[in-house]
Amino acid sequence: MYDLGNIAVMGSGSWATAIAKMLMEKVEHLHWYMRRQDAIDDFKRLEHNPSYLTSVHFDVKRITFYSDINEVVKQCQTLVFVMPSPYLKNHLKKLKQRLHDKFIITAIKGIVPDENLVCSEFFRQVYNVPDENLAVLGGPSHAEEVALGRLTYLTVGCSDQDKARSMAETLVSGYVKTKTSGDVIGIEYASVLKNVYAIAAGICNGLKYGDNFQSVLMSNAVQEMNRFLRAVYPIDRQVYDSVYLGDLLVTGYSNFSRNRVFGTMIGKGYSVKSAQIEMEMIAEGFYGTKCMKDINRMYHVNMPILDAVYNILYERISPAIEIKLLTDSFR
């Protein structure tokens, strides 16, 4: 079994907090990077994250906090990146330590803007991290349900299955079940696309489309996802597995889904800016929509749902008009 060494959670949001909760079920001591020192000070004083999942309390004596990214990278072998993809480059700007010999696990369900790269590709191309040191954590897993200890299924994807199994075993608990996969790229793209489709589901919800149509939308979404995954990385995969379809369904239907909430606001008539201001949280699918539209220009996959969401968010076409056109294309 691969020795993970010191494990660091890299991020301070709700999913980072949920992952920290899962890890502390198994590890004796956790390392945790947060950019803001004042957030660390509040965390130590309150013994919980002051901004996210405040009901989850931690034994802070078992946590070493860092606001210096170079220090945490120096001290840890396994780095779990859990921050919004638009902020990843900014967090790494101050990094002087090399990452090529670290085990990098990305739990970021988004694409790095401007680069148009899923996070594993970003670490591979920009930081020369080899495939065997890159992993992805995916699956239907709302942070709020992890906080409540509700049963959750996760998948660790890595080309090195020994490393994947080590991380998967570290996450297992009474309420977390895990498995492994070698489909790193497929899992990452699926996790990006499901956010786009959740926005579509939210827009339809805001426009008062019912459950009958929502099911048709999700059925077409999984077909669209499968077409893209086959084009970008053609391996034998079961797209109906929980890490693909399961993640799509929970993000598209759940009230915990910030992408669905964002889409619902757009469907009700909010502008993109006003919806973002009112939510006060990042809807990864907004950024993912533009990135996926750009990426698909290379592959020319038929993706009418992606196109519709892009037209609504970026071309400012009326949601009612665009979704009506989409409904006419479904059978």
Describe each model-derived feature in a short phrase.
Residues 66-74, 78-149, 167-169:
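Rossmann-like NAD(P)(H) cofactor-binding subdomain of soluble oxidoreductases
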Residues 56-64, 130-133, 174-176, 301:
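A short helix-to-beta-strand connector/capping loop
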Residues 10, 14, 18, 38, ...:
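Conserved active-site and cofactor/substrate-binding residues in soluble primary-metabolism enzymes
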Residues 74-75, 193, 245:
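Alpha-helix C-terminal capping/helix-to-coil transition sites in glycosyltransferase folds
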Residues 201-205, 230-331:
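NAD(P)-dependent Rossmann-like dehydrogenase/reductase catalytic/cofactor-binding core
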Residues 87, 98, 126-133, 151-237:
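Internal alpha-helical scaffold of NAD(P)-dependent oxidoreductase catalytic cores
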Residues 1-56, 63-67:
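NAD(P)+-binding Rossmann beta1-loop-alpha1 motif at the extreme N-terminus of oxidoreductases
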